[in-house]
Amino acid sequence: MRQIGETLAVGSVSAALRQVEDVWALPTPGSRDDFPRLVRWFTSRDDPARSSGSAAARALWAIRSAAGQVFGWDRPEAGVGSRVATLRDRLPPDLRSASAGPEFRARPFTPLYLLDDEFAAEVANRTMHAVMHLGWVPDGSGGYRGQLAVLVKPNGLPGACYMAAIRPFRHLIVYPGAMRDIARAWQGLDAR
């Protein structure tokens, strides 16, 4: 697997996304060949505002959704292809020629590329432009696991303030609950 910076910090992409916001080891133990299953599961998940196992996380998603409606953060004209150009056009030739990957069923992400052990998708709104990078990495004990990274370019000072304001909520409530949800769902996939 390429290093995140090597993959995305090429040419003008490095200028577009200059901040690694989050990196998480996912509780998704598996074999070398399980990455396609992780990508399928990740792209087919329900909206987190309705599907999170944590009531606090669902409440935060509901508040964010309401604020987005009030302030117009999530209007289509604020997204990829409108306010910001897609990063797919700025990827190096080998990634641009790769499959973009599957569409997301219930999330506003636009796939960028899919490789044997990497998947990247972008999202934009009035507060930021971000790339979600999902990788499949050795776990140190002979198996593999998922790794999630989020690279962000805030949209001006308001976007930077927004990202700073939500950081504690993401780290203390949203991501810990999401990791528990991911672990439960992954174990459920193994049971099938």
Task: Tell me the role of every PLM-derived stretch.
Residues 56-57, 150-154, 177-184:
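Short C-terminal domain-edge/linker segments immediately following a structured domain
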